[in-house]
């Protein structure tokens, strides 16, 4: 019960207009893992580059084998995986700059007592990460529940499909458990804004006579604008799903912080000496 009460208090504190923004004075958390003790960590640096290069390699392969005269870019799956790639590359570069103190990235933050203002680059990264995380979960859920085996087209690359529709969300969830910077409830609006943008894109694409690579006059069957009622149901459903996932992620973020504090106490020099 105490845990639930603490969650509700934290949730209510999040509902402030300022939390729509990206101001955060503990900027060192954007450069480190939730679980590392020191300011820099070589394992975390390697982790960031392995993640980034994996996403980049898969995305390049997807473009090569699925380009289809540009039809590759009409799908939300490929938007989402592209965002994953960009976000992971930015994170890898930022952690590298912190690790090697490029342009005094780490020194300036340490001199400020870890109270430096959030730079524009970090704000962009935070904004992208929010959209990437929510979009990955939505893509996996919608594909496996509503689209898999129900689309009027053959599955030509099953291995790629598993990576882009399944491993994407698994890897983003793993990364979410690793990173140290916070998740804000009100940042769910950025995932919603991307959903609105994609819905408008599919509508405009339909009105312009656009088709998929097999000649179907829709991007996805559940977004066939010849049946606008179904499209609106899909639209509302996606919004509700984003909200549910974001609240669950906020709870997971709080649990992660709680476990981190517990382990920090257990493995502190004083605690170890008492064992």
Curated annotation (Swiss-Prot):
Pfam families (UniProt xref): Rost
Transmembrane segments: 45-65, 72-92, 127-147, 162-182, 185-205, 232-252
Any one GO CC term of the record: membrane
Tissue: Expressed in cells of the somatic mesoderm, most notably the muscle founder cells, between embryonic stages 12 and 14, in growing muscle fibers in dorsal, lateral and ventral positions. At stage 16 strongest expression is in some ventral muscles and muscle 8. At stages 16/17 expression is restricted to some cells of the CNS, the brain and the gonads.
One GO term (biological process): myoblast fusion
Chief subcellular location: membrane
Effect of a null allele: Flies exhibit diminished fusion of embryonic myoblasts to syncytial myotubes.
Key word Nucleus present: no
Keyword flag Transmembrane: yes
Membrane topology: Multi-pass membrane protein
Keyword set, alphabetical order: Developmental protein, Membrane, Muscle protein, Transmembrane, Transmembrane helix
Annotated localization: Membrane
PANTHER family listed in its UniProt record: IP08657P-RELATED, OS02G0130600 PROTEIN-RELATED
Primary role: May have a central role in the fusion process during myogenesis, within the somatic mesoderm.
Full protein name: Protein rolling stone
